[in-house]
Design a protein with these regions (language model features):
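Intrinsically disordered, low-complexity terminal tails/loops enriched in metal-binding residues
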Residues: 1-161
Length: 161
């Protein structure tokens, strides 16, 4: 390598390091207007956030409710939920295929575990194991439900402290 090549490489590395340092130290001073949404939280908590533990699915096909064991849902502890699924006219939904996902809208990350429906308890009740919330704040938990050839999703909001 020539001296000129080494000089170009060293200058480039120093420039990149200075830019990174400037970004890290100046962003908090410049404020959120210059920050990427992931750095400041992508969404504020809506003022009218629905925190109910029972409501209709997105397309109105199912009425779904949940309970946590223990109650309220703990932080940093794997726990279980029981969800109850009914048709819109109040009949228990048996043999549904249910998947679980969720996350923190303000932080842009999902759940730290992969909760699963592990047991059909009968009468429209299903056991969900592997629930965990690793930090306080606004969480969404979504259940995708398939039963009798119909598919729908229900989302529950929680604010954990």
């Amino acid at each position: 390598m020539t001296k000129q090549t080494i000089t170009v490489i060293v200058t480039t590395v120093i420039t990149v390091l200075v830019l990174i340092a400037a970004f890290i130290f100046l962003m908090p001073i410049l404020g959120p207007r210059y920050m990427h949404p992931m750095m400041m939280g992508s969404q504020p908590v809506p003022a009218n956030l629905d925190m109910s533990t029972s409501h209709l699915s997105d397309n109105g096909l199912f009425l779904v409710s949940w309970t946590s064991d223990p109650t309220p849902p703990p932080l940093n502890q794997i726990h279980t939920w029981t969800i109850h699924v009914e048709t819109a006219d109040g009949q228990p939904v048996e043999d549904a295929d249910i998947t679980v996902n969720g996350g923190m809208p303000q932080h842009g990350h999902g759940l730290p575990t992969s909760p699963q429906v592990t047991q059909n308890l009968g009468n429209g009740d299903y056991l969900v194991e592997g629930m965990k919330f690793q930090m306080p704040g606004w969480w969404e938990v979504r259940f995708n439900i398939s039963a009798d050839g119909q598919n729908d999703t229900v989302t529950f909001n929680l604010i954990l402290e």
